[in-house]
Amino acid sequence: MRVALLLLLVAALLTQYPATAAPQAQGPGALAASALDFEYFRTRVQPIFLAKREGHTRCVSCHSKGTPMRLQALSPGAATWNEEQSRLNFRVVQARAVPNSLTSSKLLVHPLLAEGGGDFYHSGGKHWNSFLDPEWQTLANWVCGRKGNEKLVELTGACGAAD
């Protein structure tokens, strides 16, 4: 009897939400859609994913294949992404960025050396030894909602003062 009542209750609750409803974003990056700037992402953040670094492959080499942060593959012969691909990349990357939170943003801590403030995880290696690296600073400025090239003077949890 209790099982039947429980099933009836669950069925009643499920009918309140149509199957065609769009899922709501959840998790730390859920507010990122409104807080992060697409144009800054397109012109300053995306080029970092294409940059060649000594001792490493380009981010796009791995992140356009079987990784959770999957970027769009470049079109044949293209040197960068088109508008539609950039918007898809933006959606993927913003889920790894927590606006105004440097140490909660996987985008910032995964590829940063642990001794420099990063975490242990990033199977693609550590691309930056310090949060003072110019590329890392560009990513941090995006997460902090800054439009310029302000330099962070210290690595804290929240976006703080700049030079």
Protein language model annotation of sequence segments:
Residues 17-163:
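Aromatic- and Gly/Pro-enriched helix-to-coil junctions and flexible linker segments
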